[in-house]
Amino acid sequence: MPKGVNNSEKEVFEVIDFPTIDLAMTGANIARLRKAAGLSVKDLQAAFGFNSPQAIYKWQTGAALPTVDNLIGLAAMLHVQIDDILVTDNTVA
């Protein structure tokens, strides 16, 4: 504890219930947005320079999320905002 600070002066922070990303719904959303943009899994694979389409399939099934950099690129390719891709549980208090 820093000098001059006693327990009665400590700030108490309220725990905030942050939303969490719904992996399955986000994956389904990625697939839906990809199809709406007229892109194939192979198109995304080529655009990201992946050797195989496995990462794209993992995103679409909710087995994994794109990295932040890939999420930014995905949003640009799909002509949407990042918030349009991610689906949260909406449990913000």
Per-range role (PLM):
Residues 69-84:
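DNA major-groove recognition helix of helix-turn-helix/homeodomain DNA-binding modules
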